């Protein structure tokens, strides 16, 4: 009988914690217009890209800006194509906070645009341009800017 009670309470607590983890619950900070976040998924909550790679770094930079990109675009050589499929703006017009993308190399590469300089060169930050886990910065000369695609992250509507 004591074993059954213990099992019941462990199961009850486990289910409660699981539900709390699945649902962010109700956000009633603004009581004039309470917003229900049940079943609402924040695509930026978990970075599923491989640590130490350019994709992982760029995902985190976009998240810091309270913007969003998909966590399922795979190799960077496919990011522009996959972003277009997901209704993201992809073009050859760089902007601060956008993602520079190239198909060069075996897997391609992405970098985060920190600044568009007055001379139209780009100051970018990136990871794994030189080696895994290494964050570096460089300037893309203005005459090379048209060699890349630029993915423009969306506003993240899922943050409270």
Locations of the language-model features?
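N-terminal secretion targeting segments of exported proteins
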Residues: 1-39, 155-160
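Secreted/periplasmic proteins that engage bacterial cell-wall peptidoglycan
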Residues: 30-110, 126
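Structural motif
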Residues: 58, 116-118
């Amino acid at each position: 009988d004591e074993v059954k009670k213990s099992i019941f309470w462990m199961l009850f607590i486990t289910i409660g914690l699981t539900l709390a983890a699945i649902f962010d619950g109700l956000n009633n900070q603004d009581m004039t217009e309470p917003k229900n976040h049940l079943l609402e998924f924040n695509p930026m909550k978990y970075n599923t890209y491989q640590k130490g790679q350019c994709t992982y770094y760029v995902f985190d930079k976009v998240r810091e800006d309270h913007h969003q990109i998909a966590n399922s675009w795979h190799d960077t050589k496919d990011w522009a194509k996959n972003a277009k499929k997901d209704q993201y703006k992809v073009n050859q017009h760089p902007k601060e906070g956008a993602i520079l993308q190239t198909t060069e190399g075996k897997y391609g590469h992405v970098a985060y645009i920190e600044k568009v300089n007055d001379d139209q060169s780009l100051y970018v930050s990136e990871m794994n341009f030189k080696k895994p886990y290494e964050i570096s910065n460089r300037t893309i000369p203005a005459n090379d800017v048209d060699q890349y695609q630029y993915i423009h992250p969306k506003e993240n509507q899922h943050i409270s």
